[in-house]
Amino acid sequence: MNSFARLNRIMGWVMFAIALAVYTLTLEQSVSLWDCGEFASAAYRLQVVHPPGAPLFLMVGRLFSLMASSPEMVGFWINMLSAAASAGCVMFTFWITTYFAERMVDDDNKNKLLLVLGAGTVAALTNTFIDSFWFSAVESEVYAMSSFFTALTFWAVLRWWKAADDAGADRWLVFIAFMIGLALGTHMLNLLVIPTVCLAYYFRKFPVTRNGIILALGASGLALGFVMKIVYPGIPWLLATMDRIFVNDLGQSFYSGSIAAVVLILALSAYLMHYTYKTGRRNWNVIVMAAFFVVFGYSSYAMVIIRSMANPAIDM
């Protein structure tokens, strides 16, 4: 690892520490107005909040609540989830900025290291102290974790861009898809990264033309449609429909149809991954794997169904 890479990594973590310290010192001690009390209460006992449910936020919030020494401290520790997620977003903002700054400053500039790291520091600290971001960083709302996933996903796009010609670069695309799927369990804001992924893939792999850009934008629209119209509403519909058929028409036990639907999705995904790999269709193999990991990340919504069956006090 060269000196720039080492300093870049260290400075990123320094930005994380500064942001986390600021947010911890200014953290809400309990709960604030609007949805924060609902999210904190639901995360504490893994209950079900208003649709669509934010299950990943609630499950991670539950882990943070375990650090509370008393029930009075639960709100504080779930707020700490937002502080940690926001600090992570600041760290990735630093690395995203230095990635671009390194390519903008000439190599023969004697002050390149200072300029690049300085640009990243300014961007990271600006993000740290900007008003709306700071507010979401100190309360138990979903926007902090959503911002973290957005920054992480965009950083992963840049990592793929840098390694696109390497043998194992496609793993970054699969990782991006998984992060998008996980982010659905927090907020749909992360879907805004999908057009960026499609355009980055086009600009990195193909000659740039007007028609090519139009096709790349069309592909991003199809990817958004897949998530918003097939994955998001389609999987619950498939589970409910198959369960109704298995129970009402075939006389099977409750949830047998839902289990069959999950097995069907896994079997179809495994077959398509195996088929595209064996036939040498590399691009299609990556597409199938990415689609599967979006669905896999989205599976956090099973928590909403499972916990709702327990009839918790908060069950929206």
Regions found by a protein language model. Name each.
Residues 118-121, 156, 163-181, 210-222:
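Short hydrophobic alpha-helices at membrane interfaces in multi-pass membrane enzymes
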Residues 43-73, 80-84, 91:
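Short hydrophobic/aromatic helix or loop-helix immediately within or flanking a transmembrane segment
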Residues 26-28, 71-79, 104-113, 120-147, ...:
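Aromatic- and kink-enriched transmembrane "portal" helix at the membrane-lumen/periplasm boundary
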Residues 13, 80-109, 152-159:
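Transmembrane-helix motifs of polytopic, lipid-linked glycan transferases
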Residues 1-22, 88, 112-121, 261-297:
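Start-transfer (signal-anchor) and selected internal transmembrane alpha helices
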Residues 27-39, 49-61, 314-316:
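Extracytoplasmic catalytic/substrate-binding loops of multi-pass membrane glycan-assembly enzymes
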Residues 101, 106-114, 153-173, 199-210, ...:
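Membrane-interface transmembrane helices that cradle and orient dolichyl/undecaprenyl
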Residues 6-33, 127-129, 187, 225-230, ...:
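Transmembrane signal-anchor helices characteristic of membrane glycosylation enzymes that use polyprenol
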